[in-house]
Amino acid sequence: MKRLPDNLFVSQVSIPGTHDAATGNGVTLASYSQCQDIDVATQWSIGIRAFDFRPKVKGDYLNINHGIAVTNLRFDDALYLLRDSLKEHPSEFAVIHCLYASGYDSDKTKYETMLRELLSREDLKDYFVPFRRDLTVGDMRGKILLLSRDQYAGKPITGGFFQSWCGWLDWNAQSSCSIIGESAASDYKSPLWVQDYANTKDSEGGVAKKVSAVTEMLEHSTKHVTKDESDVVWVFNFASAYPGSISMANGYRENATYTNAAIIEYLQTHEAGPTGVILMDYCVDRSPNEVDGKYLTRGRELVDTLIANNYKWLERRNKTVYDKALERIDKLYEQLQEAQESIATECADVAAEFEDELAAAKDVIDQQKYEIDSLYAGWLFTESYTVDYIGTYRIIRQIEKDAEKAQAEFDEASGIHAVQAEYIGNDCQIFSLTGERLDALRRGTVCIVKFPDGKVRKVVCK
């Protein structure tokens, strides 16, 4: 994430994540509950930045479980691992999807007390960030955003709460979820789109439905335009599912061979755009984690594809905004050139007086050109960026008007009247200043005109 611009909304980042991340550290009932082949530390090292942790009370501490299956990773150890990883890599950040493993109601009081204590520890609390809809990459660097599906307190101790979570295939429901932070203010609440269709039994064509659900969410997320914080939408798109009547490790593996591949193919064949958080099973290319593993899960390839997608999208967005901005800059340079030529020919007697103003107008355009070049180089453009075309054009036009007025005043003071050629009729007599009879006015030169009423005036043809 080091190369991502600080002003980028976190909601616009494609974040690779792991479903039931801690099962890679070892888990009981592994043939039913395992979803990862590598431990959380290794997941971090390959680029995973979102982690699905399911804590559960175990004696006097919180362990991470997958349902009733117990992993070999305590929740506090997982948080300290992420803290230490962020210390070592302060340009990164981590997102946690947190859900109590099972039996929440029976453990509610104890769990809530233990979780509050853990999140408030002196050696951890400064590494958490409160949720806001407009969190940027700069806000998040070196931090952990913990988002809980259990409302363990009246308001989040840190991070935020998911609301109206949707685990079925209904776009109205999937797009009606939200995340709330510690305040009731609007900037602490964000729309959330969720795809978490998990039970994909073959007898019901569930695998095809799951793949379709994943790619349909990608259609929504990658095409969504976030011009400013009012457009922010967070997205959680679960690649995880199991194609059977009960969850099995090999079921998760089999599903991963379809969903991980579908996401890779989509991102390789469609215009790049943000995916939000993608939570996958088996973030390795073959599972079990062996060269000749049976299941071609392509998880590591998916991680790399999601990371690369950030830069493909930023380049596309950057180029689109830059090209529009550059087109306007070029037009301003044209307007300035036309003004310079007009003043030089039509206001020749006073043109020198406006050289500094024209140079200042050029400086304004040059500065805007420098700004867009710098923004482009740093991938700092946003969809709402615009060049101040109208304001700069008005500056140029005002210089022209001032020059025209100054020339008219000069002509008046010199006894010379500026006229349009068509105002001099055929019944007028035209002479040069030396008295030579002329057939017509000469543009830009002073002539003497004798009108039918007998009046004689010095005029300059404009």
What are the functions of these language-model segments?
Residues 1-46, 59-88, 93, 153-157, ...:
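Long, acidic (Asp/Glu-rich), low-complexity accessory segments flanking structured domains
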Residues 54, 96, 146, 278:
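Conserved, mostly hydrophobic/aromatic
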Residues 90-105:
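Active-site groove signature of glycoside hydrolases
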Residues 121-272:
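Surface-exposed substrate-engagement region within the catalytic domains
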Residues 312-334, 401-419:
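Low-complexity, Pro/Thr/Ser/Gly/Ala-rich linker/spacer regions in secreted
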Residues 318-326, 332, 339, 343-354, ...:
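Long, hydrophobic or amphipathic alpha-helical segments
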Residues 345, 411-462:
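C-terminal outer-membrane/trafficking sorting elements
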Residues 373-411, 461-462:
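Repeat-associated, polar segments at repeat-unit boundaries in modular proteins
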